[in-house]
Amino acid sequence: MYGLGVNRLGVTNVSSSGFNPLSLFANGEQGAWYDPSDLSSMKQLSDGTVDAVVDQPVGYIEDKSGNNSTAIQATSNKRPTLRQSGSLYYLEFEGAQGLRTANTIDFSGTDSMSVFAGARKNTDATANVAELSNNSGGNEGSFRLSAIVGDQWRYASRGDSTGLINTNANNYVAPVTNVLTGLSDISDPFVIIRVDGVQKNSSTTSQGAGNYGNYPLNVGARNNGGGFQLDGHIYSLIIRGASSSADEIASTEAYVAAETGVSL
């Protein structure tokens, strides 16, 4: 049996507690689950050919949530690289690199969002981990999980408000690796950022009205690698278009922590 985070042969990861991220999508929730520890879920080319291998670019990563939200990069020099460190696997982003879903993800049926990531930033520049739409600041019904220049992680969300409602977690000076959680609801307005299993900040400022939108999801950069490029790593990324219970949050954070090599 492969341990958590060493899922080389495509077996669905299940934590030692029995938690499986697929359970987050059991009721038809929209979203995505990207798992760099599952080498069978990745390919070198954006058309889904050429098996992924360590130290080579990744141009295609399957969505394991069952929503078919495959993320790709058609331009060869904009692809992240699959890396291994001991039992851990991750996508390394350097410079103008990023992935984007081949199709949009239709979150128009929900105004709640749960975002979980295992990420590392190597610099204290502004950089995206995940962003719904090509520019969340200019698109209603979007969110953004990112690093902000300085020592901050940020989760931001909006409905039809004039701008994003931001929550920041401070004192995370690069290089640093963390489990990041963003939770938000538009109609019952809250935006929460958690780091390593602990809530760090929240806001109940109005995000306007409406639901999340039908947009592409960007990973590791804005607009298909066009800006806010991450200099760092992504070990795990789970996007769920629904609110999550305390048990679901705790289980998912523990799962992501094991994938990332972080102790909660």
At which residue positions do the language-model features occur?
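GGW-centered surface loops in extracellular recognition modules
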Residues: 2-70, 116, 233, 244, ...
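Short surface loop/edge beta-strand patches of beta-sandwich-type extracellular domains
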Residues: 18-25, 92-113, 163-172, 223-225
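Extracellular/periplasmic catalytic domains that process cell-envelope and extracellular macromolecules
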Residues: 24-29, 83-85, 108-110, 147-148, ...
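Extracellular structured ligand-interaction cores
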Residues: 29-31, 57, 61, 88, ...
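Short beta-strand segments enriched in hydrophobic/aromatic residues
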Residues: 38, 119-121, 183-186, 223, ...
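Extracellular glycan-interaction surfaces
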Residues: 62-97, 116-126, 134, 139-207
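Extracellular glycan-interaction patches encoded by glycine-rich segments
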Residues: 158, 212-239, 244
